[in-house]
């Protein structure tokens, strides 16, 4: 890996892309520290300091925004609306015939879907921005802070509209920066910005664990968290690299005097075919009842029950519900994103076949059977990765940000980026033979 990064800076084209990507990342981090107009930044900082190390309903969104959400900055929503819009469009592609047709039209259809994703991102940003501003003005963003109601001194409608439009424009800017990285930089822009956002919160979270530790000056807690984190990173790397390769053989054809086909390839089916999406789905679904309870009367029985069972991530009821939702969404997402019949049809049209399996429907059934067997350990792995840090680090200040979701995203994005860098290095190494 170190030699690959050295090779990047020796290749002019890759060096230019790397510098461009780093420049965009710097702009993104700068925007994450620009406060929204009408926000009392000093008051926000006092409330954030009091809330540091405690759990929160918006914890996942705050981590995805690099801490900008609770800071109420220009990029407070971060890349989350874009992620949500992309997932929604991906799901709708399966059930909306028009979108499915666009998906099959190649680059032109994909461009149209990208345009729809942008529109949906802006719409979601308006809704989420309105919710953020309303939460901040009511003081519910920092329920434990006594001065939370003074975060937004100006309570006029005009001030609220300006704040919502500003945070929506910030989301559109983040989306533009992500697409710039994808088009002119290295790696996937959306994934890299998530990577940067999560990585930026880790040093502060680790230091909070050390500061609030009670044994050996907090160094024992700090070392335990680091050790568990390293073990989980190794586990994620091992599982994310694991795949089942379905062999595909293409028959040899004679066209004139030339022979075509006769090659062998494979279909890579990953153990974790669903990625991190099931964890995001499960987290979002569990946040809804807790968020409703937060805005309701605290003396009501059902609100107290939800707060008691759903706010703390180490509560047994929460753990069981979270785990079952992750397993369910893992199977659900794999079922709608991997169309075994379509893959089998494409193989058949290209003159290929899986050795020992008849082409057509038997191949589709075989692919579905293998994928279901892979999804079971993959879903259990996702559930364990998401829950082990939450349960193991319960009671450690700042450790609520060191979630399995964060580790999973950081490792996955890192592996994918390194693969793309190696691919581009190999491509440049063959340029001399192609001239």
What spans do the regions from the language model cover?
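N-terminal cationic and glycine-rich segments that engage phosphates or anionic surfaces
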Residues: 1-103, 108-435
């Amino acid at each position: 890996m170190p030699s690959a990064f050295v090779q990047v800076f020796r290749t002019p084209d890759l060096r230019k892309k790397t510098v461009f990507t780093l420049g965009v990342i710097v702009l993104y981090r700068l925007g994450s520290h620009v406060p929204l107009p009408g926000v009392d930044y000093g008051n926000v900082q006092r409330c954030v300091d009091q809330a540091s190390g405690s759990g929160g309903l918006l914890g996942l969104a705050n981590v995805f925004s690099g801490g900008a959400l609770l800071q109420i900055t220009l990029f407070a929503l971060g890349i989350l609306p874009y992620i949500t819009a992309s997932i929604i469009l991906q799901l709708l592609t399966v059930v909306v015939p028009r979108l499915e047709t666009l998906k099959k039209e190649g680059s032109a259809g994909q461009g149209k879907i990208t345009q729809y994703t942008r529109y949906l991102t802006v719409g979601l940003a308006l809704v989420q921005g309105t919710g953020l501003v309303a939460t901040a003005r009511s003081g519910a963003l920092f329920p434990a802070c006594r001065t939370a109601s003074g975060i937004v001194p100006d309570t006029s409608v005009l001030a609220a509209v300006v704040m919502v439009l500003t945070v929506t424009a910030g989301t559109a800017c983040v989306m533009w920066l992500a697409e710039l990285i994808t088009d002119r930089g290295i790696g996937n822009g959306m994934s890299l910005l998530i990577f940067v956002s999560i990585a930026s919160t880790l040093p502060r979270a680790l230091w909070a664990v050390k500061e609030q530790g009670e044994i050996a000056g907090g160094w024992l807690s700090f070392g335990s968290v680091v050790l568990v984190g390293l073990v989980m990173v190794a586990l994620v790397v091992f599982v994310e690299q694991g795949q089942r390769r379905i062999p595909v053989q293409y028959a040899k054809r004679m066209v004139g005097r030339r022979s075509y086909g006769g090659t062998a390839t494979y279909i890579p089916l990953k153990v974790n075919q669903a990625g991190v999406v099931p964890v995001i789905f499960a987290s979002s679904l569990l946040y809804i009842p807790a968020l409703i309870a937060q805005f309701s009367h605290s003396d009501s029985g059902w609100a107290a029950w939800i707060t008691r069972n759903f706010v703390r991530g180490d509560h047994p009821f929460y753990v069981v519900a979270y785990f079952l939702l992750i397993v369910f969404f893992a199977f659900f997402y794999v079922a709608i994103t991997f169309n075994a019949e379509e893959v089998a049809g494409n193989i058949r049209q290209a003159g290929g076949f899986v050795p020992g399996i008849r082409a057509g429907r038997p191949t589709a059934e075989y692919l579905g059977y293998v994928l279901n067997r892979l999804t079971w350990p993959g879903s259990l792995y996702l559930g364990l990765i998401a829950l082990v840090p939450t349960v193991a680090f319960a009671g450690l200040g700042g450790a609520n940000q060191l979630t399995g979701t964060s580790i999973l995203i950081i490792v996955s994005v890192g592996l994918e980026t390194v693969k793309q860098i190696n691919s581009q290095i190999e491509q440049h190494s063959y340029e001399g033979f192609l001239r």
